[in-house]
């Protein structure tokens, strides 16, 4: 019988892709993938080491899964990822129950190390690995959606960020290799590609021939079967007009852009080495809104950066009120050892960070409610995920401006659709993050397919839906 392996992934979508590559490598080597750690002889934990809370979550997961070595079938526990790249020796001392620690440059070696009784316990080479279309990969999301990692590493030197030390410098994948992987995913049923990298807009700057992101996007849009292409982690420093035009003019690129801006205070932008000032950021946002009507912007902000005064924070609060982002996440600054920001004076107390985060979110929640209410009565395309987790009487899906895993859902309370099908939905109700609607149109070829009955939502109920309360 094949040895069973379970993968536990923490952190960002880029980490998910790394886990999928390791799963593919293990599956190709003959391992059987399972969803229950209690059934696995081998457990792999792919960690995050970006900020303190992520490190704590990773260690807790390792300790919890180590119980399977004492109580379950597990005979080998492997820990990989950013936390290992950063703290391998310390982890090895503190966690004797772990058999192997693999850094971010060793993902391709996981099957060899797991199967070799003589393999080293610590395998932490330079972080220079980047997978290709020829690398085995198992998509861990529902088959209709997948992440496509177009580059690895980062050449920026943001004062608060440890990622370049964990992931190495920018390494872009060639266009033909990315198109080949996109085509392979489409052949498995993928209709939505979410493009990810540490710095998406830096794509190609390290490749010969002056290749950039706006050259890649039209090629991906030609892949048969791909309906939606979504852009994440777009660094704002370099967004040329050609890229804006590609997003505006190509129908398969959804009008959604995830662009972490971090702050609006010029003083803090300089201190954090972001490379652009607030005038540039405002001009960029205005250019994007003007050139791409209906664009949904998601951003991430940091409160409590070293030296952030009340005046700096008020500037950020006004910026959020002014820009009215469709989606927004706020992080409390975490002082990371080895970064310039950790050595700066005037560190902000944790209580102040929390209070500032809460104030930003209170403002954003009102903005989100207004955006959501404006959706009522509109007809939008929705990618159906399947039955809602909350109740079998609803279907759950996402419209083009709802990204997987991080944004809200569109619940369907009237109509029929298959998972992976894109249907037209009329929005009838809205909450802070989620929407409700009814199916008003389907692709005739899908509606007539001789398959088992598609999931059907229950008719709309008067008085709204409990799932939105």
UniProtKB/Swiss-Prot annotation:
E.C. numbers: 2.8.4.4
Needed cofactors: [4Fe-4S] cluster
Domain TRAM residues, every copy: 373-441
Subcellular location(s) per record: Cytoplasm
Enzyme type, top EC level: transferase
Coiled-coil regions, chain positions: none
Biased composition (Low complexity): 447-461
Keywords of this entry: 4Fe-4S, Cytoplasm, Iron, Iron-sulfur, Metal-binding, S-adenosyl-L-methionine, Transferase
Residues the entry annotates as binding [4Fe-4S] cluster 1: 12, 48, 82
Region (Disordered): 444-469
SMART domains: Elp3 (SM00729)
Gene3D superfamilies: Methylthiotransferase, N-terminal domain (3.40.50.12160), Nucleic acid-binding proteins (2.40.50.140), tm_1862 like domain (3.80.30.20)
Annotated GO CC locations: cytosol
Top-level taxon of the source organism: Bacteria
Reaction(s) catalysed by this chain's protein: L-aspartate(89)-[ribosomal protein uS12]-hydrogen + (sulfur carrier)-SH + AH2 + 2 S-adenosyl-L-methionine = 3-methylsulfanyl-L-aspartate(89)-[ribosomal protein uS12]-hydrogen + (sulfur carrier)-H + 5'-deoxyadenosine + L-methionine + A + S-adenosyl-L-homocysteine + 2 H(+)
Any Pfam family the entry gives: TRAM_2
Binding site for [4Fe-4S] cluster 2: 154, 158, 161
Location (main, coarse): cytoplasm
CDD domains registered for this protein in UniProt: Radical_SAM
Cofactor mode of binding and number, as noted: Binds 2 [4Fe-4S] clusters. One cluster is coordinated with 3 cysteines and an exchangeable S-adenosyl-L-methionine.
MF (Gene Ontology): 4 iron, 4 sulfur cluster binding; aspartic acid methylthiotransferase activity; metal ion binding; protein methylthiotransferase activity
Domain Radical SAM core: 140-370
Chain ranges of the MTTase N-terminal domain: 3-119
Role played: Catalyzes the methylthiolation of an aspartic acid residue of ribosomal protein uS12.
Record-stated family: Belongs to the methylthiotransferase family. RimO subfamily.
Protein name: Ribosomal protein uS12 methylthiotransferase RimO
């Amino acid at each position: 019988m094949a040895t069973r392996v379970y993968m536990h992934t923490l952190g960002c979508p880029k980490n998910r892709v790394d886990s999928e590559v390791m799963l593919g490598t293990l599956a190709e080597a003959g391992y059987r993938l399972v969803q229950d750690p209690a059934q696995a002889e081998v457990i792999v934990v792919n960690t995050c080491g970006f900020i303190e809370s992520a490190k704590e979550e990773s260690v807790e997961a390792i300790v919890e899964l180590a119980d399977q070595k004492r109580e379950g079938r597990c005979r080998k526990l492997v820990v990989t990822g950013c936390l290992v790249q950063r703290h391998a020796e310390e982890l090895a001392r503190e966690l004797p129950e772990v058999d192997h620690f693999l850094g971010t440059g060793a993902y391709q070696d996981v099957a060899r190390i797991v199967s070799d009784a003589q393999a080293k316990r610590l395998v932490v080479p330079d972080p220079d690995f980047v997978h290709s279309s020829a690398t085995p990969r198992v998509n861990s999301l529902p088959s209709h959606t997948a992440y496509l990692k177009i580059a690895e590493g980062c050449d920026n030197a943001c004062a608060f960020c440890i990622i370049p030390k964990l992931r190495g410098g920018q390494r872009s994948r060639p266009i033909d290799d990315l198109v080949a992987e996109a085509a392979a995913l489409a052949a498995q049923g993928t209709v939505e590609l979410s493009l990810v990298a540490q710095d998406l807009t830096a794509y190609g700057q390290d490749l010969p021939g002056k290749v950039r992101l706006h050259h890649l996007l039209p090629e991906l849009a030609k892949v048969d079967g791909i309906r939606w292409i979504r852009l994440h982690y777009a660094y704002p420093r370099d967004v040329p007009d050609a890229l804006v035009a590609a997003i505006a003019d190509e129908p398969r690129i959804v009008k959604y852009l995830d662009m972490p801006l971090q702050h609006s205070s010029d003083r803090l932008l300089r201190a954090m080495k972001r490379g652009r000032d607030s005038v540039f950021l405002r001009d960029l946002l205005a250019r994007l809104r003007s050139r791409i009507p209906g664009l949904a912007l998601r951003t991430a902000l940091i409160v409590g950066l070293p030296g952030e005064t009340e005046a700096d924070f008020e500037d950020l609060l006004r910026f959020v009120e002014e820009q009215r982002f469709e989606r927004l996440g706020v992080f409390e600054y975490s002082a990371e050892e080895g970064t310039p920001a950790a050595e700066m004076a005037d560190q902000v107390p944790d209580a102040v960070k929390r209070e500032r985060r809460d104030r930003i979110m209170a403002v954003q929640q009102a903005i989100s409610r207004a955006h959501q209410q404006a959706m009522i009565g509109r007809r939008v395309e929705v990618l159906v995920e399947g039955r809602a987790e909350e109740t079998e009487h609803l279907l759950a899906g996402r419209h083009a401006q709802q990204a997987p895993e991080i944004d809200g859902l569109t619940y369907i309370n009237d109509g029929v659709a298959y998972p992976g099908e894109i249907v037209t939905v009329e929005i009838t109700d809205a909450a802070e993050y989620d929407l409700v609607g009814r199916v008003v149109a389907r692709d005739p070829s899908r509606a007539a397919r001789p398959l088992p009955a598609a999931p059907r939502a229950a008719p709309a109920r008067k008085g709204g839906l409990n799932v939105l309360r």
